[in-house]
């Protein structure tokens, strides 16, 4: 079993505190994760000695906690090679290919992003995607390597510490070259379809038209919320569905998927405070649709 150990020296003001208090208040572990650690012998140590979460610690005591969640066992074949854009001990950012689901169904034997990451890391640990991408969407996608980092990243996902940009090719030209689409989204019926609904979840997307040609437009979209199919639903709501989007627009011969690409990602690393800023070029199938490329 692989591990990821965090270390913390108790400051004078926490003298007499319980281990649980330090883990939650200073290291940012959730109550659920602390509870799970209680059932893993040796996961928490104070000055090198196994400790309980209810134990008292004193100033200058060193607390070590293993937040790794890898487990032994075979992992499924991954399929295509993983395109890694950035990684460290706690997180990995990949360039996701088109036509691949993040998670697989038990009745489908097909490559998934989760299986690709498992094979790359050589582990059968739980997969922790942070910004999920639809099957047809390409580009930058972040995943945590352990449950602790997943919790930390999810807390900042829709804040200024985790910003995402997408490029989309739309059918039609937005009436306003740039703007904000601020309309709620909800599931429509029993289908895997969503739509604008006054009773739905608040949803906001900022967009900017970069290029127009032959009734199409290249749009940069910045979602500030994370609803399922948000950009697809929002662009369709202003009369500009994504090219190739069978669900919210119509199919096309040029592209067999929605023309959507996760093109930029900027985050502040929850542990190191390093600024991670990445850009990802348009995939070939979208580049081929731009003016002058045919």
For each feature predicted by the language model, list its residue ranges.
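RNA pseudouridine synthases
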Residues: 1-180, 184-191, 259, 285-293
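Long C-terminal interaction/binding lobes of large macromolecular proteins
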Residues: 207
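Short Pro/Gly-enriched beta-strand edge/turn motifs at strand-loop
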Residues: 65-67, 188-191, 202-204, 245-251
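Short, well-ordered beta-strand micro-motif
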Residues: 64-66, 220, 266
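Thr-Gly-centered strand-to-loop micro-motif
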Residues: 46-47, 103-104, 144, 196-197, ...
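Pseudouridine synthases involved in rRNA/tRNA modification
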Residues: 1-37, 82, 198-201, 211-214, ...
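Short histidine-centered loop motifs in beta-beta connectors
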Residues: 48-50, 214-222
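Short flexible coil/turn linkers enriched for glycine and charged/polar residues
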Residues: 88, 135-136, 162, 201, ...
